[in-house]
């Protein structure tokens, strides 16, 4: 009888990536098949996020539901991973003694051994250590699930912003070697992936070892990824302004595979609040980066993160944020009301902005961003946009759907053979959350570069070390 695995994931794209790796790993080692139905599962894993307010209580609320399933099936294994697990550790078992496994983001590769241990002597396992980059060496080869894929290139963050738990839950910055990253992407390209999204908590801080022992920069890595045949689009998430250097901006000037869309969090437009946040840059320095980016890539669109109601934020501070939003003309944002994360310096600050004032500021900010986003969308009306077709439209099974370079969802009539390929679409209608268009050119008519198949890249560049472990050498 097939054993089943259910994973519930909260939080960022890195968590989504980690969950997909957990599924691949446990399929390879134990034959577990994913199920969306928790009641069917032999193993339940909760991959948690500590960014949002009351994250811990949300975890225990979910575990309370799963406790009922364990009472019916004592052999059921329950595991808690992610940032809340890293933060809370053994405390989770003190409140929820029926949890069998607690693991951090850096120890998910040890899940097979943890499950074996629990199956053997029923002893609970807690492992929230930071074994640096070890997990990537233990994960199975990647499996593509459509024409787009996420690839983690680094872990952790050294910035220690006063409101953020990431350095405490995922550790400090550790970069994967460039050959590991390039080999993974080449494998994905061989399976039909056309767009890759490079992931890291502070992705542009990547400083990985090259095959010759030298240290590569993020700009170097972007150009190497762009050179992999089959990869026609590159995105990356999430960046920090302090390390958005001129060499990265130059890649936007000469590398068309890098999309004309960037998510670059700023958090506030007030230098005083940025200083309290520990951001180590000013609003003017942020705008200087955007100005240089638009000189290199005039059509680039920018999204950002904002925190409103940070301790000490005055009306004047908030007005400076709104001015920055207008000056940069952000296309979209992820914006939140400040809520203290336990263990961070900001948790010790006086939270002196009234809750109603926070809500009002958030509403004003989001309304302005929505207006700007709609204006950007209207400018696309009548233009021809290149779409990577991802599959059937959510709006109608008779239509297809894909994304533009600037991350707009476009629905259109097409044929099944277009899925996984590029099409050029003329935009005919604009809606708040999507666009509509008609196909004017298929991929066969585009003359896209196909100089070498991804399979031949792998065959030509695959090397093995003394242990028989494959690696990539340009």
Swiss-Prot record:
Report the domain of life of the source organism. Answer: Bacteria
- Subcellular localization: Cytoplasm
Which E.C. number(s) belong to this protein? Answer: 2.8.4.3
Q: Name one GO cellular component term.
A: cytosol
Q: Which UniProt keywords apply?
A: 4Fe-4S, Cytoplasm, Iron, Iron-sulfur, Metal-binding, S-adenosyl-L-methionine, Transferase, tRNA processing
Sorted alphabetically, which PROSITE patterns does this protein's record hold?
Answer: MTTASE_N, MTTASE_RADICAL, RADICAL_SAM, TRAM
Which is an annotated GO molecular function term of this record? metal ion binding
Q: What is the lineage of its organism?
A: Bacteria, Pseudomonadati, Pseudomonadota, Gammaproteobacteria, Enterobacterales
* Name of the protein in its database record: tRNA-2-methylthio-N(6)-dimethylallyladenosine synthase
Q: Which residues form the Radical SAM core domain?
A: 143-375
How many and how are cofactors bound here? Binds 2 [4Fe-4S] clusters. One cluster is coordinated with 3 cysteines and an exchangeable S-adenosyl-L-methionine.
